[in-house]
């Protein structure tokens, strides 16, 4: 389907059309009439089809809240109330790419598949996850994905771990075998990433 500037289509208005010889295709930018959301449509003959919903997320501080939200919204939604839809999709879909990414200024949720129906299914799950996440009803999701205190852990572990300048308080149980430790999916992911010397070289 060839689109022309100012053409109306399913609640969108075509703003620009540009030939892209590098990918033997055409790029279209459309604006959603009601919300103002922008849609970039790349048309070419590639058998692999992709979809992504993305948001500008410039941070106000270094708490990593957008990275935590990226993980949190993929922990169930109104339409798909399963604990880990992302993991289920990895196992059951014909996807060729499935991920979510937080950059310094944006957060993206891209998917790809060579099967048209599979792509629509993936887009349906991702759109519901992003627009209707279970995090609104289950605060524990945010705490699980971000950071939280847990009683337990290795007493030999470092006592100096910190988040937002707050040192972890070391406590022991009555038998002296456990202490209060920080845990969380994104917390541990970033701790691992930032402990790699190559990340700062």
Regions picked out by a protein language model, each given a short descriptive name:
Residues 37-38, 93-94, 187-188:
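Short alpha-helical segments and helix-capping/turn motifs at coil-helix boundaries
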Residues 2-46:
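N- or domain-start disorder-to-order transition segments that initiate the globular core
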Residues 25, 43-128, 132-140, 195-197:
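M16/MPP (pitrilysin/insulinase) zinc-metallopeptidase core fold and M16-derived inactive scaffolds
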Residues 151:
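Positively charged, phosphate-engaging catalytic surfaces used for nucleic-acid and nucleotide handling
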Residues 138-148:
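Short, glycine/acidic-rich hinge or "gate" loops at secondary-structure transitions
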Residues 76-78, 122-136, 155-201:
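Scaffold signal of the M16-like zinc-metallopeptidase fold and its non-catalytic homologs
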Residues 3-6, 94-95, 161, 166:
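Generic N-terminal segment detector
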Residues 20, 30-31, 43, 89, ...:
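A general structural signal for short secondary-structure junctions and capping/turn motifs
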